[in-house]
Amino acid sequence: HMAIPRIGQEVIVDYLDGDCDQPIVTGRTYRATNRPPYALPDHKILSTIKSKEYKGSRANELRIDDTTAQISAALMSDHGASALHLGYLTHPRPEGGKPRGEGFELRTDEHGAVRAAKGLLLSTEEQLRAGAGHLDRGVVVQVLEA
């Protein structure tokens, strides 16, 4: 994974084998003009990578929420209000975090498409804890043939 720092961000610099001619950026850090996405310590349970649109005001966000008994993950883009939410679904924690459901949600205010050249299995058949192959359809076939 490589995330190139943007102009104005503070970075942590180390040196390969202690050689000052071989600097390497090993991380980024926050400062007064580059604050964490959500207020601390109020939202200490959120691990977030949030970008800002170049010459714009929108953002993309990867958020991992480790709230006890309500863990979740989300990948979101302000463009089209598009998002993939996984786990315990809530409204954003900084806005109160009211429950919305459990499982997953893939949503957009724009168009969406699902493509699979070799086929697509869409089922409501239970397969707890991913206990079989992702294309396992034995039970589905049994139900259809019954």
Spans of model-derived segments:
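Structural signature for extended repeat/solenoid scaffolds and their inter-repeat hinge/linker regions
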Residues: 1-146
